[in-house]
């Protein structure tokens, strides 16, 4: 297993190895903070094996609460799209099975996504101590270490800088795919610079 960074014991150093088998995740939520009651409304992920995309996961989640208009404006996800969709427990059960053969997940600003996945696990299993069970790499850490001079390390900025896309779509699966391409570009840059 790769070296860990300080803080969350699940967090791995993005420069501790050349990851080739991993899952890249992205989430869409009803707000910015689990602590303020925001909930998951979409999980998107891509499974990578030997640097090739081999599987995708994309599920909407019914939070059983209103999706704020600013979230609908950003993601296009509204209340009508979530009616009849599975609840958090059903989706987390399926996501856990889907992730079970891969030890490492990645996300950009992973603490955000992981906090929502931790909360979803806690809600799904009525266990306040439960947590999402995978080690994770934060590509935000990698960007900051590669380019400490940059003012912005947002996905929307980086995907343009690395010529991946013109804009972030703010839908979980498409964002996960962009973050996968971003990780590969930054990892290759780190290798060229002798950082990996």
Where are these regions (language model features)?
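Generic alpha-helical structural context detector
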Residues: 141-144, 160, 181-184
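Conserved beta-strand -> loop -> alpha-helix junction used to position metal-binding or nucleic-acid-contacting
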Residues: 130-143
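Acidic, divalent-metal-coordinating active-site segment for phosphoryl/phosphodiester hydrolysis
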Residues: 171-184
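Mixed-charge, glycine-rich, non-catalytic linkers/tails in nucleic-acid processing enzymes
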Residues: 186-196
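Conserved non-catalytic scaffold segment of RNase H-like nuclease domains
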Residues: 2-133, 148-170
């Amino acid at each position: 297993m790769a070296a860990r960074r300080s803080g969350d014991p699940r967090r791995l150093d993005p420069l501790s190895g050349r990851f080739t088998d991993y899952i890249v995740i992205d989430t869409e939520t009803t707000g910015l903070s689990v602590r303020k009651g925001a909930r998951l409304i979409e999980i998107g992920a891509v499974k990578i094996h030997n640097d090739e995309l081999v599987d995708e996961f994309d599920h909407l989640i019914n939070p059983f609460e209103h999706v704020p208009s600013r979230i609908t404006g950003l993601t296009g996800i509204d209340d009508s799209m979530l009616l009849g969709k599975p609840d958090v427990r059903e989706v987390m059960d399926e996501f856990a099975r889907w992730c079970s053969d891969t030890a490492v997940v990645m996300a950009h600003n992973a603490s955000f996504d992981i906090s929502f996945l931790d909360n979803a696990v806690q809600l799904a299993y009525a266990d306040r101590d439960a947590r999402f069970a995978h080690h994770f790499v934060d590509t935000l850490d990698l960007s900051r270490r590669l380019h400490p001079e940059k003012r912005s390390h947002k996905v929307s900025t980086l995907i343009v800088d690395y010529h991946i896309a013109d804009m972030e779509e703010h839908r979980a699966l498409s964002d996960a795919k962009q973050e996968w391409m971003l990780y590969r570009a930054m990892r290759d840059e780190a290798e060229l610079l002798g950082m990996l």
